[in-house]
Amino acid sequence: MANVIVIGAQWGDEGKGKITDLLSRSADMVVRSQGGVNAGHTIVVQGQTFKLHLIPSGILYPDTECIIGSGTVIDPKVLLQELAQLQGFGVSTENLFISQTAHVTMPYHRLLDKASEERRGKRKIGTTGRGIGPTYADKSERIGIRVVDLMNPDDLREKLEWTINYKNVILDKLYNLEPLDPQSVISEYLEYAEQLRPYVVDSSLKIYDAIKKRKNILFEGAQGTLLDLDHGTYPYVTSSNPIAGGACVGSGIGPTVIDRVIGVAKAYTTRVGEGPFPTELHGEIGELLGDRGAEFGTTTGRARRCGWFDGVIGRYAVRINGLDCLAITKLDVLDELKEIKVCVAYELDGKICHDFPSNASEFARCQPIYETLPGWQTSTSDCRTLDDLPKPALNYLKFLAELMEAPIAIVSLGASRDQTIIVEDPIHGPKRALLHANGEPVSITND
């Protein structure tokens, strides 16, 4: 039995979908604990591409139960579209379960999200416009609509009539937008409720029952560490907690049941939206990374900003999440480069900085300090063991492991399941001790 959290160690889009899909083969249950339709993951199986936003990656395994946990925010229309997409490809959805305490994204959330972002002007955050922030804001303000409310028509009518009238004042007076018709919204969401009713459960209880039965449970994170509301590049963050601790809160389980935490990071760095990005590349190499890596957001379609690997934020992710091991993805994207740079520290106001600064204005002033490594200029997409890799590629991985102070358990070399090197068992491998504590440098594995 193992309970494992998979999180993003950068700004999201690290390839968590593929890694979770791979690990789901050994999982009895996959749990999505936070975020909403602002996060997307792409899975390629036998040439078929699945792009999902809410449904966990494990849904493609017929015997794996999938939970959309209480920390998520659910757009019923999008969720039903995903269900229809999967069913259209012959994928069973009978093992999907939705937390009754998850919050629901409403039409006014989307309107307010877009209007607020537009009103910010130069101070915009770069949101997806899907209503995620306003949904979480209502949750904190304690006026949110939860899935359990959808299941009770009388409660839903009472709550929505009051809430929509309240939101209409803001839409009209602050943003000069047309007010919503409460009865139209109520009718729409009552229809969604009936379609989703068979999937709704007490998710915390269901997860706990699986823990007591010593099942293998995979907790699938959305977005990435540097987008965390408390520990990310605030204010250019999401509205939830994508770090490992957030998986426990958003699933309704205690931290003592977690056995391992796996961090997923690209072999380079990308970011979507606004905010500081010290290693960002604006020229030919940045374009090459974007083209070879197909760096366009699953949710928004926006081009991702690309840059060199940032070891400073990598070490920060290891610390904040207590990572036991790493999965490095898209190594093959670097195949054509003659040399590769890695950020090992920052220069901040004339001083060397080895740690991530929590102040956004300081982070924006950070200049990367690079070490340059030789490239390999040969294809790695068909490599299936470390021995298959060109020596410079292997040395690059060793450098990243030592820089981040965490062993590498998985190396991904393409979108397909088989384009993967399993270095060590990522689920049942050893717990990570404090690396370097005994004076010994970390290598690719803990051996």
Curated annotation (Swiss-Prot):
Question: Entry's CDD domains?
Answer: AdSS
Q: Where along the chain is substrate bound?
A: 298-304
| Domain of life according to the entry | Bacteria
Major localization class: cytoplasm
Its required cofactor(s), as named, are:
Mg(2+)
PROSITE patterns attached to this UniProt entry: ADENYLOSUCCIN_SYN_1, ADENYLOSUCCIN_SYN_2
What does the entry list as the binding residues for Mg(2+)? Answer: 13, 40
UniProt binding sites for IMP: 13-16, 38-41, 128, 142, 223, 238, 302
| Keywords of this entry | Cytoplasm, GTP-binding, Ligase, Magnesium, Metal-binding, Nucleotide-binding, Purine biosynthesis
Q: Which GO terms describe its cellular component?
A: cytoplasm
GO terms in the biological process aspect are: 'de novo' AMP biosynthetic process; IMP metabolic process
**Can the keyword Nucleotide-binding be found in this entry's annotation?**
yes
Q: In which pathway does it act?
A: Purine metabolism; AMP biosynthesis via de novo pathway; AMP from IMP: step 1/2
Q: Which major enzyme category is it? A: ligase
Q: Which reaction does it catalyse?
A: IMP + L-aspartate + GTP = N(6)-(1,2-dicarboxyethyl)-AMP + GDP + phosphate + 2 H(+)
- Residues at the active site: 13 (proton acceptor), 41 (proton donor)
**Is Phosphoprotein found in the keyword set?**
no
The protein's assembly and partners? Homodimer.
The record's section on NCBIfam families has:
PRK01117.1, purA
Role of this protein: Plays an important role in the de novo pathway of purine nucleotide biosynthesis. Catalyzes the first committed step in the biosynthesis of AMP from IMP.
Provide the family line. Belongs to the adenylosuccinate synthetase family.
Q: What is this protein called?
A: Adenylosuccinate synthetase
